[in-house]
């Protein structure tokens, strides 16, 4: 295991925003025994452990992350347990899985085709789009607890709500997810739905610059976060090289050379403007990781 641990690995290019400093220690495991040994070493060394997947919903501090960063990008594999029931490792792409299951005629993940994250991140954040969310098809997850115990946890025990789960408060590593999909559908029809979702996404969301998707959660009710940010005149606002997208006000773009501090400052400005105009304090959809990067509110 020690020969796979790397000190001082830059995390910027491993995230959608392409900002952030180095990991004190970095590991990209592919085997269970390597992961178990590394987590045991971190416990004995009293080092904090941070787990990342596709890096699509993260803002990492400019000074980096202390302790051990476990990158599950290569933790891949899908097992068909029965018709419509699959076990998927945490590093698998949720968008790729949406295509694969649609081609089998299994419905339930079509909404996820444009979501650039991993299965593990989708579980932790209860990712969603187009009125659907990951919890709709999730049966259970396999986790590695802070004591090194492997445990199967039913979806009903995870506190899954809009863009939230109890996993965000636990020092557990999500290893895999068990999904129950609906077989018996026409693959061509499911692919047609996927194409419709893709067309909508390309029409309404910006591309061309690094971004992590929606910055703030929708607060509930009729007013969406993007709508309020738009009406508050925030499109095009910038801090350093971080800019609110002109196409969608709930996106922040890294136009080249932005820092995590730039993005955090811009997010704070956006939040404060919406509070002043609408009396609603938007909550981040982005997770903040690393030293010196704190969200006030």
UniProtKB/Swiss-Prot annotation:
Q: Which organism is it from?
A: Gloeobacter violaceus (strain ATCC 29082 / PCC 7421)
Example GO molecular function term?
A: UDP-N-acetylmuramate dehydrogenase activity
Q: What is this protein called?
A: UDP-N-acetylenolpyruvoylglucosamine reductase
Which residues does the UniProt record annotate as the domain FAD-binding PCMH-type?
A: 18-184
* Compartments it resides in: Cytoplasm
Describe the task this protein carries out. Answer: Cell wall formation.
Q: List the disulfide bonds.
A: none
Task: Please verify whether the record's keywords include Cytoplasm.
Answer: yes
Identify the EC number(s).
1.3.1.98
Q: Which NCBIfam families match?
A: murB, PRK13905.1
Report the active site residues: 163, 214 (proton donor), 285
Gene that specifies this protein: murB
């Amino acid at each position: 295991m020690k020969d796979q641990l790397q000190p001082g690995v830059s995390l910027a290019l491993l995230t959608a925003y392409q900002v952030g400093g180095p990991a004190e220690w970095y590991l990209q495991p592919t085997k269970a025994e390597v992961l178990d040994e590394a987590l045991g070493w971190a416990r004995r060394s009293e080092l904090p452990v941070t787990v990342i997947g596709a890096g699509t919903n993260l803002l990492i501090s400019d000074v980096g992350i202390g302790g051990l960063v476990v990158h599950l990008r290569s933790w891949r594999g899908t097992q068909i347990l029965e018709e419509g029931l699959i076990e998927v490792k945490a590093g698998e792409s949720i968008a790729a899985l949406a295509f694969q299951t649609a081609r089998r005629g299994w419905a339930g993940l079509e909404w996820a085709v444009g979501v650039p994250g991993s299965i593990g991140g989708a579980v932790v954040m209860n990712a969603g789009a187009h009125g659907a969310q990951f919890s709709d098809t999730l049966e259970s997850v396999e986790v590695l607890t802070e004591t090194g115990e492997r445990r199967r946890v039913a979806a009903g025990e995870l506190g899954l709500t809009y863009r939230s789960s109890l996993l965000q408060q636990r020092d557990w590593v999500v290893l895999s997810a068990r999904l129950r999909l609906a077989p018996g559908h026409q693959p061509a029809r499911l692919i047609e739905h996927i194409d419709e979702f893709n067309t909508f996404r390309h029409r309404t969301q910006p591309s061309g610059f690094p971004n992590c998707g929606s910055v703030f959660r929708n607060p509930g009710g009729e007013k969406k976060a993007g709508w309020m940010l738009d009406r508050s005149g925030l499109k095009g606002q910038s801090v350093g090289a971080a800019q609110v997208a002109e196409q969608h006000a709930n996106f922040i773009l890294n136009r080249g050379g932005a820092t995590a501090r730039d993005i955090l400052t811009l997010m704070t400005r956006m939040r404060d403007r919406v509070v002043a105009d609408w009396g609603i304090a938007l909550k981040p959809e982005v997770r903040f990781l690393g030293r010196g990067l704190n969200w006030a509110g």
